[in-house]
Amino acid sequence: MDEKCRKRFDSYKKSLASLAEARERDMRDSFVLSGTSAKFSITFDLAWKVMKDILVQHYAIIDFVAGSPREVLRAAFRAKLIDEEIWMEMLKVRNQLAHDYDGQIVEKYCEDIVKVYIGRLEDFRDVAEAVLADAAQDDF
């Protein structure tokens, strides 16, 4: 994996660790809610970009039409990196959160973010680490 991709993956892991702190926070606090929303969106965006890096560099998948998150998620599912259904749901939530001007959307999805989505983001982190470790061994 090239340096740019490695840095993106490191940023993803740091962002995910920060997001995971939401599990210990009081979700009735509006500041915590808005922080969880922002951190989820950032972490999700880093995740699909890391997926794209892996697909291009380790699976030689380069036939993306637009390179959109939806397209990358579908390719990542076909490569068995993720479960497509939950990730499409997460994409939908991320898109809705971008237009959450009064905090109602994050209130609606906060429990899913904390109890389900963080776990899926952690699962992908583990899969990505395994793929990258295998690739590093192949380099030797």
At which residue positions do the language-model features occur?
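Solvent-exposed interaction patches of small proteins and small membrane subunits
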Residues: 1-140
